[in-house]
Amino acid sequence: MESTVGPACPPGRTVTKRPWALAEDTPRGPDSPPKRPRPNSLPLTTTFRPLPPPPQTTSAVDPSSHSPVNPPRDQHATDTADEKPRAASPALSDASGPPTPDIPLSPGGTHARDPDADPDSPDLDSMWSASVIPNALPSHILAETFERHLRGLLRGVRAPLAIGPLWARLDYLCSLAVVLEEAGMVDRGLGRHLWRLTRRGPPAAADAVAPRPLMGFYEAATQNQADCQLWALLRRGLTTASTLRWGPQGPCFSPQWLKHNASLRPDVQSSAVMFGRVNEPTARSLLFRYCVGRADDGGEAGADTRRFIFHEPSDLAEENVHTCGVLMDGHTGMVGASLDILVCPRDIHGYLAPVPKTPLAFYEVKCRAKYAFDPMDPSDPTASAYEDLMAHRSPEAFRAFIRSIPKPSVRYFAPGRVPGPEEALVTQDQAWSEAHASGEKRRCSAADRALVELNSGVVSEVLLFGAPDLGRHTISPVSWSSGDLVRREPVFANPRHPNFKQILVQGYVLDSHFPDCPPHPHLVTFIGRHRTSAEEGVTFRLEDGAGALGAAGPSKASILPNQAVPIALIITPVRIDPEIYKAIQRSSRLAFDDTLAELWASRSPGPGPAAAETTSSSPTTGRSSR
């Protein structure tokens, strides 16, 4: 689960900012000059374009060949005949720019050969799985960071204009796959197989490469998230919701994005964070037991369900179904997200395999530790409000319970105003208004104001749980005073809160891979309490209540002894304006350009690319993906 987004980005010369509403770029032909200044002229303010095509050589060149026109620097024509130039994707070969360093495919090997032309390429097991990579990695693999790879790529080009963000990320992922293969952690031939799929993007695509094969592989391999060292390694040099900042003009990438998420171990956890880590599985169990259907329960009648085989790592618990690893955006490879719950089937290799043109529902789970009260404390106002809620089960009792703490999780703001960024859930319903509610005017960006208007009509669903049955060791939902099992409240997600921004980033990443499957995001709020002495050490089985919901869930769903006793589950749909995705994409390209130029300007003179020490083992060539 991602950490929350921080405050708006601090002012700084190198922070890239652009308006949220972006006009389309003017089309530029292949002969157009680059828009940005010389590489050592900082800061950069525009996105670079491909260099003009290099002069044509007098020798005949097969136009269908994907090999570089010129050999890498310091590589002479005396190379042996069996050392082929490194094969590139069609898009990369068409783009201009110098070739990459002379990077061996394996220790003692030669240049990376075209996977399609290598007769010794091993046959890949048709049942290979992305989830077989162990959680712990050897130190030499942990050293294969994106920053180190990027610096190695710069040693092999004559100008940073030759390297684009998407190509750089795909080249890194491909090289990492080969390293994993050499270490025996994935099937032989998998690295080349993934690159063959990646370079077969549709010719009409902007980058003419297909990022999903590589990026989907790593998403499937990192579903254990924080318990997986590969997950931590991939997040290094990747901008996530916790490191992306939001200013008045939209998303701001930190100048230090390449250094972000550098720690392979989680920071020291606060009690609130630990409460969330322990009880996120609780919320997941409740969600799948009562509210959300599983995507692995089978398809519609007549559908080819063999394609949609539910697949999870063998060490994932039942309550962790539909969890996601780190998925990188398919536009620039600069942004990553690890969704808590994505209701999407997977294929036999572990890849996300949504039904075409079907909405993708995903859920971001937040466990509110500030409601974790001691029910045995008679002086606690929250405990008293809880007793009243269990006795009456009315909307009035629920609102009183939510307001029983100093900073309630639902914040009221008057119509015509905008909410502050303090709470993730807000409402304009007069029933939630309090006598001491603040009527102050707040400043708000036009984009946030538009998102408030877009979400103001959303209604949340609230599921209430009764006290545990100590005789039968069960917990079940209870009906409200109206007789309904689900209460609909006019409460919506606050676009100014970090939780909303996190969901926005997740939607952007999903949309980049599945544009024909509109994302349907939700914010799930779990409220639970501490246990009484009689409840300590007891595992409670989840059962249906009176008027049970129709969604079938796993029969073995339960609440473990270390988890909180559930009180309520609030499910809030979230509406996102896809126009914001353009701002994220533009800002990510600008941030990459600025960082690349800084690395270029600060590089030290060294040997040519053929002798330079690099970490890449990729069977690609270094060309711009733009």
Curated annotation (Swiss-Prot):
This is Alkaline nuclease. Its EC number is 3.1.-.-. Plays a role in processing non linear or branched viral DNA intermediates in order to promote the production of mature packaged unit-length linear progeny viral DNA molecules. Exhibits endonuclease and exonuclease activities and accepts both double-stranded and single-stranded DNA as substrate. Exonuclease digestion of DNA is in the 5'-> 3' direction and the products are 5'-monophosphate nucleosides. Additionally, forms a recombinase with the major DNA-binding protein, which displays strand exchange activity. Belongs to the herpesviridae alkaline nuclease family. One of its GO terms (molecular function) is DNA binding. Keywords: Endonuclease, Exonuclease, Host cytoplasm, Host mitochondrion, Host nucleus, Host-virus interaction, Hydrolase, Nuclease. InterPro entries: Herpes_alk_exo (IPR001616), Restrct_endonuc-II-like (IPR011335), Viral_alk_exo (IPR034720). Residues 1-127, 601-626 are annotated as: Disordered. Residues 73-86 have a biased composition (Basic and acidic residues). GO terms for cellular component: host cell mitochondrion; host cell nucleus. It is found in: Host nucleus; Host cytoplasm. It is an enzyme of class 3 (hydrolase). Forms a complex with the DNA polymerase, the DNA polymerase processivity factor, and the major DNA binding protein. Interacts with the host MRN complex composed of MRE11, RAD50 and NBN; these interactions may help in recombination or repair of the viral DNA. Interacts with host MSH6, a component of the post-replicative DNA mismatch repair system (MMR). It comes from the Viruses. Residues 609-626 have a biased composition (Low complexity). The lineage of its organism: Viruses, Duplodnaviria, Heunggongvirae, Peploviricota, Herviviricetes. Pfam families: Viral_alk_exo. The record marks 280, 340, 364, 366 as: Required for function. It comes from Human herpesvirus 1 (strain 17). Residues 59-68 have a biased composition (Polar residues).
